[in-house]
């Protein structure tokens, strides 16, 4: 048997982290078993489905590297197939037309609630032979009257539901459109899905869907339902917790494999291992190690993993991802150091690519923004003379290298009997505009000689202006 899994999002909003974890687990299971992973877009909600959301799903999957073997299939392109199967079920007596009005169904629901009964359809039209007479009708599934639906969930274990608890669900609405529970069964059947891995919010649908599979003499897939992901406050993950869309994490500067590594550990474990390459995930993944407990999304842990990969990945690969952030900021990368050289010194100082871009823009711009507090603290008249001497020493350098730059700084600090920080920190503010940067010799080396000398000259003018006021 060839394992075939699927990811079936609805294009009614962004691709959120819960959906991404479902896609990841489905993808990993298929890859682990040398199977196939199918993407299906469940776009039957015509009012809420948008092409923008479809594109966001495709873009998110591509960014994460979750490539699919088939698809994307669209449910809206399969309406004829759903109608065909519905007609087949009608002819076999496994479905029936229901002409109950909304008013009758609402009155039934209110009466059942008043009697403290579970709201459900009462089968009013079940045994009536209603022709297609032009009166609006829905098509309902004739659910078995007796017996038990039993299935083994790969996460939750054995589950048993009495058929008496299930009513006759609607397969086709009065406008001819299929319902979710009907379309998904036909799709999984036609697409030969062997394993359905999805969120546990679908677990209550499973007994109904199993009855449909059996009514169609279709093979019933294996089911695995994943517990939900909560925010750190124990509430369902939402926008109030921060980024929840996969492409928002790209904007925040999270590397795609860092996000995958983080998500795979939300509800799945392999011993005490925390760091997984994508290939290690594929090799190790097993549904038996998926936890039944809910998971909490921890941004600190995600950024810890992200920084790990920023430091352990090659500077070239991190630079490729970082380039997008500079482009979004409108920064001309031709005006500064090679990005891989920047990554080599900044990776361990930042938790994300977005932060790395933000704190490194002074390397690529002609004009820098000065932190006024840093200017007041470090660009004082007392450092004017040492910085003037340092300016001349640096300007005279034939080789603009770290060791030569550091040698100049050391010599000037000795000449003026200053602690090294008393000269290095004013120099840092002069060339970066702030009091933080990589080591001062590395900062100047990356900036280049011309830019460093020009900024030091501008800072000297600032100090002279300040001295004249004093």
UniProtKB/Swiss-Prot annotation:
One GO molecular-function entry: ATP binding
Enzyme class (EC, first level): ligase
Motif 'KMSKS' region positions after renumbering to this chain: 236-240
Keywords: Aminoacyl-tRNA synthetase, ATP-binding, Cytoplasm, Ligase, Nucleotide-binding, Protein biosynthesis
InterPro entries: aa-tRNA-synth_I_cd-bd, aa-tRNA-synth_I_codon-bd_sub2, aa-tRNA-synth_I_CS, aa_tRNA-synth_I_cd-bd_sf, Glu-tRNA-ligase_bac/mito, Glu/Gln-tRNA-synth, Glu/Gln-tRNA-synth_Ib_cat-dom, GluQ/Sye
Statement: the UniProt record of this protein carries the keyword Aminoacyl-tRNA synthetase: yes
EC number: 6.1.1.17
GO biological process per UniProt: glutamyl-tRNA aminoacylation
One Pfam family of this chain: Anticodon_2
Positions that bind ATP: 239
Location within or outside the cell: Cytoplasm
Cellular compartments per GO CC: cytosol
Job of this protein: Catalyzes the attachment of glutamate to tRNA(Glu) in a two-step reaction: glutamate is first activated by ATP to form Glu-AMP and then transferred to the acceptor end of tRNA(Glu).
Family the UniProt entry places it in: Belongs to the class-I aminoacyl-tRNA synthetase family. Glutamate--tRNA ligase type 1 subfamily.
Protein name listed in UniProt: Glutamate--tRNA ligase
Classification of source organism: Bacteria, Pseudomonadati, Pseudomonadota, Gammaproteobacteria, Legionellales
Chain's gene name: gltX
